[in-house]
Design a protein with these regions (language model features):
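Macrodomain-like recognition of ADP-ribose-binding/processing modules
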Residues: 1-147
């Protein structure tokens, strides 16, 4: 794995990067960077169309953390409702699912913001350690955009 953090706008990275960010199972996209993701990629409509009963499946199966690939966006599901807060456990489970998707789809480059640490209030040192630990045995390049 190649990991680096840069002071740059996430949405200026080349299009060969997949973009990762956090969402909730209800696909609520009203605050934070997810608003820009939705505006650029029409994610809420696409996810609701593709996964109309996702929240019930997630709750029934007690998944805890997940990741849904839509186009070039990796949607890390770290909480049930938009107003909930994720835990480092749900973040870890979502990151593990993202790794699985990367391996299945031969995804080699991911760019992401400082996930889970804005409105969600996780500690970035904890989250970045999870990312490094989970992706350590891969050849995926992870670029964290800190602007």
């Amino acid at each position: 794995m190649k990991y680096r953090e840069e002071n740059k706008d996430l949405f200026t990275v080349p299009e060969y990067y997949y973009l990762a960010h956090c969402i909730s199972t209800d696909f609520g996209m009203g605050k934070g960077i997810v608003v820009e993701f939705n505006k650029r990629f029409d994610l809420k409509r696409k996810l609701q169309t593709k996964y109309p009963d996702y929240i019930n499946q997630y709750t029934h199966k007690r998944i805890g953390g997940d990741c849904l690939l839509e186009g070039r966006v990796l949607n890390l599901i770290t909480k049930e409702r938009y107003f909930h807060k994720p835990t480092i456990i749900t973040m870890r489970l979502a990151l593990k699912k993202m790794k699985q998707i990367c391996l299945e789809h031969n995804i080699k480059k991911i760019a992401m913001p400082v996930i889970g640490c804005g409105l969600d209030r996780l500690n970035w040192n904890d989250v970045s350690e999870q990312i490094k630990d989970i992706f350590a045995d891969t050849n995926v390049e992870i670029l964290v955009c800190k602007r």
